Curated annotation (Swiss-Prot):
It comes from the Bacteria. This is Fatty acid oxidation complex subunit alpha. NAD(+) binds at residues 324, 343, 400-402, 407, 429, 453. The active site is at residue 450. The gene is fadB.
Length: 716
């Protein structure tokens, strides 16, 4: 053994080829500070051993290296620029040491080689991947750019255009695609991986592979004619801005770094990259996006723990077909759990099956699936008009019309057809789980399971715990949601649960603006372009459906009359009363037509303005900051109330619910991250300016106390 540490072992193979194996103590290899220090020490040992003629990098795990240890980032990025620069330069010195070894080097890539893992293989001369490999630089998803030489070496290996696409889109690449552009040199079966990499090193040693020319190319300025460079970078900037926009600076920073470093050698280019990396690391956007990544891991970790208490779900059922039922059936069947789709009407069953088939057909057309896989998924869905079909189900998801009496009747019927230990869940968005539980003989096996529409696209599922729901019930439904490929958050029962409870104060803030004469299209523009929502409140209400919005608003007003009760009509009432239901009947706040691709296209409709002005008078202009404050303060305060009341268990789950459930702008990180970034004291001072508008704008005593103590919701 040439070198051994808790994360890396180096041994000498035949023909004086050294094998450096990444083998961290956890389930995967990551680049934390310990591993970088171990790699540095291992390379020193390798350099000192004069018998070594070549080096092979491998992994003892099922993946190569998944990237940097993100958990270290938030504390690391709190340090001053000089300390952070020293850390980046120290890490880069290690990668340079690997690249500068006096003999050929190769990487045998199994599974994921992402971020720092990808930068590691780029520092070697030769790269062989197995058929399961995935290679990429995902840093821009975290608001960063690669910091260990990714923007320097990748363009010199695969060309500027390909490298910019890889870096700015942050997508994992399949091995065949990586081979096509020259990022790797061969793709082999997993069982042949190490042998193929060793053979490549032999080819380098005997002169049939010019490893030194490959290395020199990586260490030299980018070979790109001036005119071609101008066109390449101008095109990349245009494409990046159209996709990322102004709120996500990392992709554009990556283009600028590659451009600025194009004429420099490796060491000069690495300095450009390091300075840009540090600048981005200090941004609120990076803090927010890294926070989302860590929150996602936290929520999924909780779901994994719940899995230990969960019962197996081998057969599921959904009651109520149609679009929602079809979406749930598709999601279950596509992830391997057969499901019965039960309804009382054949046309509804056909609609549900058509919904599943439509999703699958689109996937096949886009090359994301095959006709064989489509057939397998559809065969996993059994439509039925008979309750007898659900008798062997381990879980039944009720998804009938959103009406308490109808749901209660259906739930009582279901209990008579399933086994004693089958779990029953209601896909309701507003109806109290405790109320619905009264219709069951065994309420302990019942909870809420709130899917968001469209089911196949929306990652969140709210699992609602009723006062009688058992831990096994909650754990099983959480595990089933995870198995379906969803991110579950567990919330306690209250009107609107979590997501709708905090969404409707936002709509109330919007309605208040319109009642004072604000232009709904102007409000949408500010909330989309400046705050960063994917849709402004008027557009979102049209998409949700103003009938749905009107119903949910009434539920919220009844549940929280002090804050959400209304005096007189608001804009939602006016649209609903005039049968303007949104996209579903082509007219809401906006008018809708179908574009060439068959998608809804919105247009300004004068009738909406006439209806609103008849009630609220002439239009009046509002400042952008005023619009944002009027809409966001109610949502933020209500979200904090949910944490204080125990509706949600943690800021992390609250923020993930908002980002995944209603599209809260990821670059802001969620309400709690937004509050911490803004400063709780600053928010309280802002809210106090609007407190005269009513309870929705009045902060809680606990918020005021936190502000006075200069506290935060996330602990550093």
């Amino acid at each position: 053994m040439i070198y051994q540490s808790p994360t890396i072992q180096v041994e000498l193979l035949e023909d004086n080829i050294a094998k450096l194996c990444f083998n961290a103590q956890g389930s995967v290899n990551k680049f934390d500070r310990e591993t970088i220090a171990s790699l540095d020490a291992a390379l020193d040992s390798i350099k000192q051993n004069t018998n070594i003629k070549a080096l092979l990098l491998t992994s003892a795990k099922s993946t190569f290296i998944v990237g940097a240890d993100i958990t270290e980032f938030l504390t690391l990025f709190q340090q001053d620029d000089a300390t952070l620069l020293a850390w980046v330069e120290q890490a880069n010195a290690v990668f340079n040491k690997l690249e500068d070894l006096p003999f050929p080097t190769a990487s045998a890539i199994n599974g994921f080689a992402l971020g720092g893992g990808c930068e590691t293989i780029l520092a070697t001369d030769l790269r062989v991947a197995d058929t399961n490999a995935r290679i990429g630089l995902p840093e821009t998803k975290l608001g960063l750019i690669p910091g260990f030489g990714g923007t320097v070496r990748l363009p010199r290996v695969i060309g500027a255009d390909n490298a910019l696409e890889w870096i700015t889109t942050a997508k994992d690449q399949r091995p065949e695609d990586a081979l096509k552009v020259g990022a790797i040199d061969a793709v082999v079966a997993p069982e042949n991986l190490e042998a193929a990499a060793i053979q490549m090193l032999h080819d380098a040693l005997n002169g049939s592979l010019d490893w030194q020319a490959r290395r020199t190319k990586k260490q030299s300025p980018l070979q790109l004619p001036k005119l071609e460079a101008m066109m390449s970078f101008a095109t990349a900037k245009g494409m990046v801005f159209s996709v990322a926009g102004k709120h996500y600076p990392a992709p554009m920073a990556a283009v600028n770094v590659v451009e600025q470093a194009a004429g420099l050698d490796r060491d000069g280019a690495l300095k450009v990259e390091a300075l840009a990396f540090i600048k981005l690391a200090k941004t609120d956007v990076a803090q927010a996006l890294i926070g989302i990544f860590l929150n996602d891991q936290f929520v999924k970790g909780k779901a994994k723990k719940a899995g230990k208490l969960a019962k197996d779900v081998n057969q599921a059922a959904v009651l109520g077909a149609g679009i929602m039922g079809g979406g749930i059936a598709y999601q279950s069947a596509s992830k391997g759990t057969p499901i019965v789709m039960k309804d009382i009407a054949q046309p509804a069953l056909e609609l549900g099956l058509n919904e599943a088939a439509k999703i699958l057909t689109t996937q096949v057309a886009r090359g994301r699936s095959t006709p064989e896989k489509m057939a397998k998924v559809l065969n996993n869905i059994t439509p039925s008009l008979d309750y007898a079909a659900i008798k062997n189900s381990d879980i039944v998801v009720e998804a009938v019309v959103e009406h308490p009496k109808v749901k209660a009747t259906v739930l009582a019927e279901v209990e008579g057809y399933v086994s004693e230990d089958a779990i029953i869940a209601s896909n309701t968005s507003t109806i109290s789980i405790n109320l619905l539980a009264k219709s069951l003989k065994k309420p302990e096996r019942f909870c809420g399971m709130h899917f968001f529409n469209p089911v196949h696209k929306m990652p969140l599922v709210e699992i609602i715990r009723g006062e009688h729901s058992s831990e096994e019930t909650i754990a099983t439904v959480v595990a089933y949601a995870s198995k379906m490929g969803k991110t579950p958050i567990v919330v306690n029962d209250c009107p609107g649960f979590f997501v709708n409870r905090v969404l409707f104060p936002y709509f109330a803030g919007f309605s208040g603006l319109l009642a004072e004469g604000a232009d709904f299209a102007a409000v949408d523009k500010v909330m989309e372009k400046q705050f960063g929502w994917p849709m402004g409140p008027a557009y979102l209400l049209d998409v949700v459906g103003l009938d749905t919005g009107h119903h949910a608003q009434a539920v919220m007003a009844e549940g929280f009359p002090d804050r959400m009760g209304k005096n007189g009509k608001d804009a939602i009432d006016i649209m609903f009363e005039n049968k303007r239901l949104g996209q579903k009947n082509t007219k809401g706040f906006y008018a809708y037509s179908v574009d060439r691709r068959g998608k809804p296209k919105k247009d300004i409709d004068p009738t909406s303005y006439e209806l609103l002005s008849a009630e609220f008078g002439e239009l009046k202009a509002f400042e952008s900051d005023d619009i944002i404050a009027r809409c966001m303060i109610p949502m933020i305060i209500e979200t904090v109330r949910c944490l204080e009341e125990g509706i949600i268990a943690s800021p992390a789950e609250g923020d993930m619910g908002l980002v995944y459930g209603i599209g809260f702008p990821p670059f802001r990180g969620g309400v709690f991250r937004y509050l911490d970034t803004m400063g709780v004291a600053n928010f309280v001072a802002l809210a106090d300016k609007y407190a005269h508008l009513g309870g929705l704008y009045q902060v809680t005593d606990a918020m005021r106390a936190l502000a006075a103590n200069n506290g935060s919701y996330y602990q550093a």
